[in-house]
Swiss-Prot record:
Keyword annotations: Decarboxylase, Lyase, Pyrimidine biosynthesis
CDD domains: OMP_decarboxylase_like (cd04725)
Highest taxon in the source lineage: Bacteria
Gene3D superfamilies per UniProt: Aldolase class I (3.20.20.70)
One Gene Ontology molecular-function label: orotidine-5'-phosphate decarboxylase activity
Protein name (database record): Orotidine 5'-phosphate decarboxylase
Protein residues bound to substrate: 8, 30, 57-66, 114, 176, 185, 205-206
Name of the coding gene: pyrF
Subunit structure: Homodimer.
Reactions catalysed according to its record: orotidine 5'-phosphate + H(+) = UMP + CO2
């Protein structure tokens, strides 16, 4: 069980100020597109020097050979987790895993973004079936082609574990202290909800980064995440 703090900042200066002025050195962190595309691999090196576990959330989605070569470079960074899109297909997923074969980095596949609702699935993407059915299918595709796990809202974790095996990892973003606080993610949850359905990892962003007291918010989220199973 690991809780990642989403470093949704535009540059290293703001990231550094947030982490180290708030006594958050060494906490597991998520680096997304905004920060990585601004700072490049150097941000990973800086975070590793300060003993952070790192979830690199780039959601790669390209032709298989391009993703394979990108993953070989990502493998050299030594991050703990990295994401791709399952909608790139079986060969892309397999080539992504192949690019990581000499590293300890785990491959996590995105099924449907947590910002997507049934309206988008049915009328914009025109995918057959509802969200749970599509997520289960894409999770099975990811597992069959070597992925270590998938990104999943709390609503799909149980079905993924049932379909793919309990050892198949699930990472749940969109964690809030109040499940009605949705912002731009439609399928959100609290730390307790994620624990109770069996999520292996969670990502907490605004609830910590926009708090007046980030360290206190971090400790509260961590406590709620870790202790929910004891209730």
């Amino acid at each position: 069980m690991t809780m990642f703090v989403a470093l949704d900042f535009p540059d290293w200066k703001q990231t550094e100020a947030f982490l180290y002025k708030n006594e958050l050195q060494g906490v597991p962190v998520k680096v997304g597109m905004e920060l990585f595309y601004k700072e490049g691999p150097s941000v990973i090196e800086k975070l590793k020097r300060n003993n952070h576990s790192i979830f690199l959330d780039l959601k790669l989605h390209d032709i298989p050979n391009t993703v394979h070569r990108a993953m070989k470079n990502i493998a050299s960074l030594g991050v703990d987790l990295v994401t791709i899109h399952t909608l790139g297909g079986s060969e892309m997923i397999a080539q992504a895993k192949r690019g990581l074969e000499h590293s300890q980095t785990k491959l996590i596949a995105v099924t449907l973004l947590t910002s997507v609702d049934e309206e988008v699935v049915q009328h914009q993407l025109r995918l057959p079936g509802n969200i749970p059915a599509n997520v289960a299918h894409l999770a099975s595709l990811a597992k069959a082609n070597g992925a270590d796990g998938v990104v999943s809202s709390v609503h799909e974790v149980a079905s993924i574990k049932k379909t793919c095996d309990t050892s198949f990892l699930t990472l749940t973003p969109g964690i809030r202290f109040d499940s009605s606080d949705v912002h731009d993610q439609k399928r959100v949850a609290t730390p307790e909800m994620a624990n109770q359905v069996g999520s292996d990892f969670i990502v907490v962003g605004r609830a910590i980064t926009q708090s007046d007291h980030p360290y206190t918010a971090y400790m509260e989220a961590k406590k709620r995440w870790e202790e929910a199973s004891d209730e």
